[in-house]
Design a protein with these regions (language model features):
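N-terminal/domain-start alpha-helical segments
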Residues: 1-101
Length: 101
């Protein structure tokens, strides 16, 4: 299973990648929206773990415009334990959410 991790915090990303690879998942890491869009042109991951807040834009918009139409399962990743963001992500169609430690 190939997982695309979209996260701009390298320390957090390294921890997530390590944990997922220990479970035998193949993880591809992208730092921002543009890298993610470029990757999705030629690749289709089995799952996307997507940060809501990225340096070049909003994860919700990326999901709505580029990911949801491809029907790729997505889990939002958020630093904020903000119920509004969680509800918004789930209402948009995300499969789940994770709050950052």
């Amino acid at each position: 299973m190939k997982i695309l991790l979209v996260e701009d915090n390298n320390i957090l990303a390294k921890g997530l990648i390590y944990s997922l690879e220990q479970k035998q998942y193949n993880v591809v890491h992208k730092l921002n929206i543009q890298e993610t869009i470029n990757y999705l042109i030629y690749n289709r991951p089995s799952l996307i773990i997507l940060d809501i807040s990225l340096p070049d834009g909003n994860g919700f918009e990326l999901y709505t415009q580029k990911i949801k139409p491809q029907k790729i399962p997505t889990i939002f990743l958020t630093a904020k334990d903000d119920e509004d963001d969680i509800v918004k992500g789930l209402e948009l169609g995300a499969d789940d959410y994770i709050t950052k430690p």
